[in-house]
Structure formats: structure tokens, C-alpha cells
């Protein structure tokens, strides 16, 4: 336990929790402190000036990160016939209709993202209590309810990231791996921030982006000057 505490303390050294760093410096600090034996995920967190309890202040969307996420995303597609064949050809990991619904209802969720054709939604709607809390429910607003299942599968596999603001007004996402070069992480973070800004709801008043921070899986959070991310 003492060794673990000492290692954590060493990782946190040099990070001032009260200072706002420019994005490039923050990325360097996060990469330097990602010393775990696995390739840590780099996550960005944005605290927004919204109250998602109000419908006109909900923030959600999807962004295609220019350099991908660095993770293997397993995609499930609810479709029949030709569309099911298109999804399989595009690289979907799981494809089905009624039988897939039954599998998910049984508690087996061996995928990270769901896509459905519009005609499947009455059936998929039964899975709201299972997929909803996991943020996996297909939604036309983020392109996961579509007839272009092949395009949606390729986007999901290629770096598409969904985001949705949480109760505390925070939106976050994994935007790459610590092994990415600094420029790739910078481009991904700016793409994510740009998408969040474009998703600003009509009900948002005052300062929209309040705080921004990035961290690796096992590393400390590094606060960022918002203007260096949103510029």
C-alpha cells in the first residue's frame, strides 16, 4: 500500500491543481505521467454552463475524431435482410433482429455501440431500460438510427464518439491513447471541443464552457485554459 501511495504521489508531482495550463503543455504532462503497463486512455472533461434537467439545456451529439480513438469498438446492428448484409460487410460485430433483442434482454451485451434501421426501432425500443443507462440506445440525432448502416458502422469503427451531458453539467469522452503523438491528441481534443460548442443548446445562458481538464486512465487531471481548446 505504501508503494502504491508513493507511486501516485510521484505521478502527481509537478501538476498544480490550481493552475490552468495551455493545451499543448497539458498534453505533454498527461503523456509523461501515463506510466501504467497498459496503453492508457486519454480523456477530456468539459464542465458546461447548462442544467440538463431542462430539455432546452441538453447537450448531446457525435463527433468523428480525426485520429480515431485507438480502441477496438465493437458494433451491434439491428437490421433485417439487405441492410443486415450491408452491416456485416461493413464490419459490424453483431447483426440481428428479434434474436439479437432476446440476447440483449438476457443480459448479454458484447458490444460498445448500437445502430438500428428506422423500421427496427419499435423492437429495439423494448431495450430502453437495458441500453439507455449505458448510453447505447440508438438515436437519429447522433446518426445511429439510419438506413445507411454501412456508413454508420464505418464511422463507429473509425473514431466516432458520442457525447451527452451528465447531471452535473459535465460532458466527457475518451479521445485517444497515451501512445498517440501530442499533435494527434491535440487535434482530437479540439475536434471534440468544437463539436460540444456547436451542440450548445438554445437554453444555455452565460459562460458555456466553464472548465476543461484532461487526464489519462491512471494519471491526475490537468486543468486547461478553455481558450486554448476552443480557439
From Swiss-Prot:
GO terms for cellular component: cytosolic large ribosomal subunit. InterPro entries: Ribosom_uL1_bac-type, Ribosomal_uL1, Ribosomal_uL1-like, Ribosomal_uL1/biogenesis, Ribosomal_uL1_3-a/b-sand, Ribosomal_uL1_CS. GO terms for biological process: regulation of translation; translation. PROSITE patterns: RIBOSOMAL_L1 (PS01199). One of its GO terms (molecular function) is rRNA binding. Signal peptide: none annotated. Keywords: Repressor, Ribonucleoprotein, Ribosomal protein, RNA-binding, rRNA-binding, Translation regulation, tRNA-binding. It comes from the Bacteria. Belongs to the universal ribosomal protein uL1 family. Binds directly to 23S rRNA. The L1 stalk is quite mobile in the ribosome, and is involved in E site tRNA release. Protein L1 is also a translational repressor protein, it controls the translation of the L11 operon by binding to its mRNA. HAMAP family: Ribosomal_uL1_B (MF_01318_B). This is Large ribosomal subunit protein uL1. It comes from Agrobacterium fabrum (strain C58 / ATCC 33970). The lineage of its organism: Bacteria, Pseudomonadati, Pseudomonadota, Alphaproteobacteria, Hyphomicrobiales. The gene is rplA.
Amino acid at each position: 500500500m505504501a508503494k502504491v501511495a508513493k507511486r501516485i504521489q510521484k505521478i502527481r508531482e509537478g501538476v498544480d491543481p490550481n493552475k490552468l495550463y495551455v493545451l499543448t503543455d497539458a498534453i505533454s504532462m498527461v503523456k509523461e505521467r501515463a506510466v501504467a503497463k497498459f496503453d492508457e486512455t486519454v480523456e477530456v472533461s468539459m464542465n458546461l454552463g447548462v442544467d440538463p434537467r431542462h430539455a432546452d439545456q441538453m447537450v448531446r451529439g457525435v463527433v468523428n475524431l480525426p485520429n480515431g480513438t485507438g480502441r477496438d469498438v465493437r458494433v451491434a446492428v439491428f437490421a433485417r435482410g439487405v441492410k443486415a448484409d450491408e452491416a456485416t460487410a461493413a464490419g459490424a460485430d453483431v447483426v440481428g433482429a428479434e434474436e439479437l433483442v432476446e440476447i440483449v434482454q438476457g443480459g448479454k451485451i458484447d458490444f460498445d455501440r448500437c445502430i438500428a434501421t428506422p423500421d427496427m426501432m419499435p423492437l429495439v425500443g423494448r431495450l430502453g431500460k437495458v441500453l439507455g443507462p449505458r448510453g447505447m440506445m440508438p438515436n437519429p440525432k447522433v446518426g445511429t438510427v439510419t438506413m445507411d448502416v454501412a456508413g454508420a458502422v464505418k464511422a463507429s469503427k473509425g473514431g466516432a464518439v458520442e457525447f451527452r451531458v451528465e447531471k452535473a453539467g459535465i460532458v466527457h469522452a475518451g479521445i485517444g491513447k497515451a501512445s498517440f503523438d501530442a499533435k494527434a491528441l491535440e487535434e482530437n481534443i479540439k475536434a471534440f471541443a468544437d463539436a460540444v460548442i456547436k451542440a450548445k443548446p438554445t437554453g444555455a445562458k452565460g459562460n458555456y464552457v466553464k472548465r476543461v481538464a484532461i487526464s489519462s486512465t491512471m494519471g491526475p487531471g490537468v486543468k486547461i485554459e478553455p481558450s486554448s481548446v476552443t480557439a
